[in-house]
Structure formats: structure tokens, C-alpha cells
Amino acid sequence: MDTTQSNGQTDTQGQLHAQTAEGGNDFGRRNPLEIGVQLRNLVNRGDFLTVQYAGGQLVTRLLEVDVRGRTFTFDWGALSDQNRGLLGAPRCQFHAQPDGVRVEFATATPRETRFEGLPAFEADFPEVLFYVQRREYFRVDAPILDPYVCSGRLPEGDTFRFEVHDLSLGGVGMRTADERVAELPMGTRLLDCELVLGALGRLSLDLQLVSHRSTALPNGTQRYQLGFRFLTLPGSAENTLQRLITQLEMKRRSLVR
């Protein structure tokens, strides 16, 4: 997996406990069965997670969940230094953002194991798993007919044009059959992207890749779904997106009545 270095470690539980105290809502899952369900959802969807530890971080995927044993297995990193660092870390923080929901939890030191003949990590269930769906993560599907599009340049300078799948105040989901995205590392930043939103006009925004999935179509081609978060969202852009999200949600509700 692709890795990046970090000088510190986020106190995830402290941040989310503070949010709980302020908002009056407890986002924590403490029942091992509930924790197992959330971890299995990450396995089934193939979502990427970022694991932060003292001195670094790596991007991984969950491979298997053992609810009875209260353990889970996750993918080995690409760099031996990161793997050694993680095996020696007293505490590991996991972060994921599947479908606009923030999933975060912490574990003690993981162990080296094998999964399908290959090296992997195994860790005990966390004591608490935070599952947070906040206002900025509420997503609505974009129109299929006359779809919205996002265009810009990939890190190498090549242009792209992807179809918008869904929207929130926190980011945008896109889909494409463009094979160039298969090798985009997590955390990739795409700057000055143009989001074309039909009658509401255009927005110029900086994006960062936070999720990446591929699906094989019946004809054998791959379809890629990409999730990006907005690095910054100016007030005018937020107002435009909020109006659009409200309109799309009202239209959706009118169709299901």
C-alpha cells in the first residue's frame, strides 16, 4: 500500500469525546457485536483506512474480522520500515470515511500474522469505535441524466473529466472508467478542479482523494468510484452546495411519495 510520513498522531478518541460532550450525542460503539458489524462493513466494501502511529502512517484495508475472537486482520504495508514501526507502536489510530460516514478507532500494538499465505497484521477489537455522520457528511446522489462533471488535471499534468456521483458539504464522489485513476495513491491532491453543477453554475475547488473502489462490469471493463474531500470550502461555495443538496433531497423525497 502507499504510505506517507507523519510527525505526530491524532488523539482521535479525545477529539470525538469532546464532540460528544458538546453535541450531547454518543457516537461510540462499545458492544463487540456492533464493533464487529462496522468492521465487517469495511471489509465487504473494500474501503481504505489510514493507520497512524508514532512516527508515521500507512494506508491499508481490513481483510478479515473474527467476532468470536474479537480480532481483525488488516493488510501489510508496502515498506518494511513502516511495518516495523507499526509492530512496535504502543497505540494505533484508524481512520476511514466510507460513504460520508466517519469511522475512527484506536487499538494497542498489532501482531504479525498470515492471511492467504501473505504477511498481514492482526489486532484486538478496539474498546470503542466511533461512527459519526455529521451535517457536512450528509450525501445526496447527483442526477444521472444530464450529470454533473468535475474536470481538472491529474498530478502528472494530464487533464481529466469525471462524472459526479454524489455530493456533500464535505466532499464529492465521482465515477469513471478512466484507467489512469487505478494507480492514484490515497491522499492525492487535485488543485483548481472545476465542478460543473448544471443551472447552479461552476465551482473551483481543491480536492483530496480519501476513498477508491473498483467494480468489474459485465463487459470486463473496470468502473472506478472515487471519494474526494474538499481541502477548503469558501463560504460562497458552501452556500451554493447547500442549496443544491437541499434541492436534490427535496426532489428525491417527492419521487418516493
Curated annotation (Swiss-Prot):
Record keywords: Bacterial flagellum, c-di-GMP, Nucleotide-binding
Source organism (scientific name): Paraburkholderia phytofirmans (strain DSM 17436 / LMG 22146 / PsJN)
Coiled-coil features, chain-numbered ranges: none
Primary location group: other
Domain of life from the UniProt record: Bacteria
GO cellular component term, pick one: bacterial-type flagellum basal body
Subcellular location: Bacterial flagellum basal body
Function: Acts as a flagellar brake, regulating swimming and swarming in a bis-(3'-5') cyclic diguanylic acid (c-di-GMP)-dependent manner. Binds 1 c-di-GMP dimer per subunit. Increasing levels of c-di-GMP lead to decreased motility.
UniProt KW Nucleotide-binding keyword: yes
Family, as annotated: Belongs to the YcgR family.
Protein name according to UniProt: Flagellar brake protein YcgR 1
Disulfide pairings: none
Domain PilZ: 133-246
Lineage: Bacteria, Pseudomonadati, Pseudomonadota, Betaproteobacteria, Burkholderiales
GO BP terms, alphabetized: bacterial-type flagellum-dependent cell motility; regulation of bacterial-type flagellum-dependent cell motility by regulation of motor speed
Compositional bias (Polar residues): 1-18
Region (Disordered): 1-30
Pfam families: PilZ, PilZN
Subunit (UniProt): Monomer. Interacts with the flagellar basal bodies.
GO molecular function: cyclic-di-GMP binding
